[in-house]
A protein has these predicted regions:
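Acidic, glycine-rich low-complexity/disordered segments
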Residues: 1-91, 109-112, 168
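Gram-negative/organellar outer-membrane beta-barrel architecture
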Residues: 63-175
Length: 175
């Protein structure tokens, strides 16, 4: 019952009998059934991909743990600066009486460039450059390009990480 609220309580004190009788009133509201996911984002995230992360099906009864699980799955990607997951207001019900879950996403900067210089007695001098691109394919992916130039060890590489690949909780990493 997502719309439960506490109504005013009533407390009766009987000084002669030394008793206190509190009466709590709670309005449970109606039973809430969930619709799909509505994504609010200015970024590149594919709304269908986000909907695939939802642990409920259309028509399932509202469970706050399932809504929190969707938020956790999005947080685990590490691609977003801000994530908000909430049940839509009562006035946004569908004709069937279902309520969508609203997901608002704020993307990180698409590109991050890192550079560094090192020196050690074992490897000598070196320069590192790393470029990371986030959410290039609209599914919270991370592409990392790395180059290292040093006296002894030089290398170039790329890593691609696709979180929740084909099903939630599974990440595909290619390098």
């Amino acid at each position: 019952y997502a719309d439960a609220k506490a109504d005013p309580r009533r407390v009766v004190v009987d000084n002669a009998a030394y008793t206190v009788a509190p009466e709590y009133r709670i309005d449970s509201g109606g039973l809430v059934r969930l619709d799909g996911v509505r994504v609010l984002s200015r970024g590149r995230t594919n709304p269908e991909w986000v909907a695939g992360l939802a642990p409920w099906k259309e028509g399932d009864r509202y469970d706050p743990d399932q809504v929190a699980e969707l938020e956790r799955r999005l947080l685990d990607t590490g691609v977003y600066d801000g994530i908000g997951v909430s049940l839509s207001p009562v006035d946004q019900k569908t004709a069937e009486g279902l309520r969508p879950v609203i997901v608002s996403l704020q993307d990180r900067p698409r590109r991050v460039l890192e550079a560094g210089a090192t020196w050690s007695t074992a490897d000598g001098a070196g320069v590192d450059v790393i470029q990371t691109r986030y959410n290039r394919f609209g599914r919270a992916d991370t592409l990392r390009l790395e180059a290292r130039l040093a006296d002894i060890d030089s290398r170039i590489g790329a890593d691609l990480s696709l979180p929740h690949w084909r099903r939630p909780g599974r990440t595909l990493k290619l390098g």
